[in-house]
């Protein structure tokens, strides 16, 4: 959960997730919808899908016991070098360096290493140095300490050097410019996107469709369409509504909202739609949800923001 997600966001989801899926077998037995719903709000939903797939494989291949060898961990769905190393080190105390953004930043400053954060060259250099630092016993404690140090003290901006236990050994601090290490990651240029979304209601239920694209795949959302202008997005949405047996109640939006995902700045226009005829819709990628079902459905933050904007409009 903590990969590319802030601690404060994870804190609200971690314990409910463990309550819902207390062990590997429970996670493996759950449907993808159940797992995505429990993950809702954390973003990067491929992590949740891979976590479930890994649980299924652990149950099928290893009898529900997580393998303790790095080479076996790497074979699990969604487990790259870092995830395999993190589990081996933090869960089993093995002498395996697990280098994520915080550890990379801490050791880059200790050794005054320059490079692009997250780049292969810098990550390999830091991993090599981390391996030499790990003790033969309880290596996971050192790994966790470095992660916490980067999270709480050796922060990207304004590091709290006077309270750092590594201050006397930090080459970047001796230089007087620790904040400049290891360097800056190039930021992608912002991209403006127009999104038109339709809220359709029938007998007290709301129509949601399942996303098929890579971004947010498998999540439920209001019918929507993206384009490079509001009018193009509206026309694209009108075309999408036809096979769903819906049409605009009015060509004017009832609400507007904004949403940002990484470098995508999304301007949202919310329209009301209504069923055409009986609308006895029968398709696996569309479903009428009762209001009480929405709280536990696999719905992304963007969709909840659209619903909130519509509710505020009255």
Label the model's feature ranges.
Residues 151-314:
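Intrinsically disordered, low-complexity, charged terminal extensions of DNA damage-control enzymes
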Residues 2-175, 179, 192, 242-247:
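Catalytic cores of DNA base-excision repair glycosylases
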């Amino acid at each position: 959960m903590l990969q590319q997600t802030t601690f404060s966001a994870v804190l609200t989801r971690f314990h409910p997730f463990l309550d819902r899926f207390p062990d590997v077998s429970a996670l493996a037995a759950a449907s993808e919808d159940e797992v995505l719903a429990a993950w809702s709000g954390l973003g990067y939903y491929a992590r949740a899908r891979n976590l479930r797939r890994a649980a299924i494989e652990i149950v099928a291949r290893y009898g529900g016991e997580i393998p303790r060898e790095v080479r076996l961990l790497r074979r699990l769905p969604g487990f790259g070098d870092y995830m395999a190393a993190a589990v081996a080190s933090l869960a089993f105390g093995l002498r395996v360096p697990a280098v994520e953004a915080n550890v990379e930043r801490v050791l880059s400053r200790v050794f005054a290493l320059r490079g692009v954060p997250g780049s292969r060259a810098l990550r390999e250099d830091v991993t090599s140095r981390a391996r030499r630092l790990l003790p033969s016993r309880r290596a996971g404690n050192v790994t966790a300490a470095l992660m916490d140090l980067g999270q709480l003290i050796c922060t990207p901006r304004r590091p709290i050097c006077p309270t750092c236990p590594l201050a006397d050994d930090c080459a970047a601090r001796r230089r007087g410019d620790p904040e400049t290490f290891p360097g800056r990651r190039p930021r992608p240029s912002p991209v403006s996107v127009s999104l038109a979304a339709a809220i359709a209601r029938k007998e007290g239920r709301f129509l949601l469709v399942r996303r098929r694209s890579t971004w947010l795949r498998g999540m439920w959302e209001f019918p929507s369409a993206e384009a490079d202008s509001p009018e193009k997005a509206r026309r694209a949405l009108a075309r999408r509504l036809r096979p769903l047996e819906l049409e605009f109640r009015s060509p004017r939006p009832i609400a507007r909202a904004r949403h940002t995902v990484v470098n995508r700045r999304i301007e949202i226009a919310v329209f009301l739609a209504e069923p055409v005829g009986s609308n006895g819709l029968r398709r696996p990628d569309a479903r009428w949800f009762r209001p009480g079902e929405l709280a536990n459905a696999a719905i992304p933050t963007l969709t909840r923001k659209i619903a909130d904007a519509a509710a505020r409009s009255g």
